[in-house]
Amino acid sequence: MDRILTKEEKQALISLLDLEPQYWGDYGRMQKCYKKKCLQLHPDKGGNEELMQQLNTLWTKLKDGLYRVRLLLGPSQVRRLGKDQWNLSLQQTFSGTYFRRLCRLPITCLRNKGISTCNCILCLLRKQHFLLKKSWRVPCLVLGECYCIDCFALWFGLPVTNMLVPLYAQFLAPIPVDWLDLNVHEVYNPASGMTLMLPPPPADPESSTILTQEDTGPTLMGQQDTLTSRRNTGKSFSLSGMLMRTSPAKKSYHHQKMNSPPGIPIPPPPLFLFPVTAPVPPVTRNTQETQAERENEYMPMAPQIHLYSQIREPTHQEEEEPQYEEIPIYLELLPENPNQHLALTSTARRSLRRKYHKHNSHIITQRQRNRLRRLVLMIFLLSLGGFFLTLFFLIKRKMHL
């Protein structure tokens, strides 16, 4: 990022983009400024043609340099496309699940650097950082050569904390996914739901004609990187395959329109698996009968009873009967000791209680100290009085002699 353009070209591009120097390196912000300036400086809009040509030249040089830096890093596990053939950003690749795929759990993903087994985007780029340093044998990397969160924080001078993750997500969103050298099929997928069950295995495994495709690379919409077809042996060790072999009756729950390739997540089935007949509209009859049928469609409401009508003052002859409530099952597991707390206290209450006990213990210690001081002072005064009394008697005795 700092060696693609010269110092003069960098200052010229910053002035043409009306960009603050502190945002140099923020590709998304620079791209927005570039598009805005293109609308202002375009000759058809009445702009300056020379400035427009200079802006296009510098921006193209910067973009080609960033692409070339990532291309020359070494062998890639995914297919490399041309700079004009791949314009899909990282956020467009993952669309609605981008922010959940970026960081799976910030508490652990930010703490574990080289030993993380997570496959979110943040952890994958961090692992890529160590692999690049090992392959290049360089002491450090800068933004543009590596897009991990550590290089991002070092470039902009920010601490790596939980508050940095949203800024890092906004920074990575407009960057082309091909620059990141990520296999999008290996990125953490937080989508929840059922997976379509595989069809039942044939009687003869060798006669199966179902071919499965394995693909790699960041391509979408059917553009596969490497296609390797293998023959299905009819044995599936997945959960869906075992469920299919153990309970073949579950096939009847799936609708016929849900015949799509296996492995595609679909939302879970509704709560009511069996069809329920809709209520038949009432036939035009008398007005009173129609109104009664409409009211029967809804759940009957409890009769409204005034509170004061249910209260009775107890007399001396009549005693109040105790009202017993049904005890839930989980209460049977509670201890029989009534002094034991049944509800968990919060952390704030525990800290206040601990502080109160500490304060009380401190007060008791201070009282003991005061008592000890008084005792020592009393002993000192008594000894001092005895000393002066002895001295007085000695002087008086000498005077008589």
From Swiss-Prot:
Membrane side Cytoplasmic: residue ranges: 1-374
Annotated stretches, region: Disordered: 213-235
Compartments, as annotated in UniProt: Host membrane
Recorded GO CC terms: host cell membrane; membrane
Gene3D superfamilies for the chain: DnaJ domain, Small t-antigen, unique domain
Domain J per the UniProt entry, residue ranges: 12-75
Stated consequence of mutating Y324F: 70% loss of interaction with host Fyn
Membrane topology according to the record: Single-pass membrane protein
Topological domain spans for side Extracellular: 396-401
Annotated TM spans: 375-395
Keywords: Early protein, Host membrane, Host-virus interaction, Membrane, Oncogene, Phosphoprotein, Transmembrane, Transmembrane helix
Summary of subunit composition and partner proteins: Interacts with host Ppp2/PP2A A and C subunits; this interaction alters PP2A substrate specificity and localization. Interacts with host Fyn.
Function: Plays a role in transformation by modulating the activities of cellular proteins involved in control of cell proliferation and by acting as a functional homolog of an activated tyrosine kinase-associated growth-factor receptor. Recruits upon association with Ppp2/PP2A the Src tyrosine kinase component Fyn, thereby activating its kinase activity. In turn, MT becomes phosphorylated and mediates signal transduction pathways leading to cell cycle progression and cell division. MT also plays a role in regulation of early and late gene expression as well as viral DNA replication.
Name recorded for this polypeptide: Middle T antigen
Species the sequence originates in: Hamster polyomavirus (HaPyV)
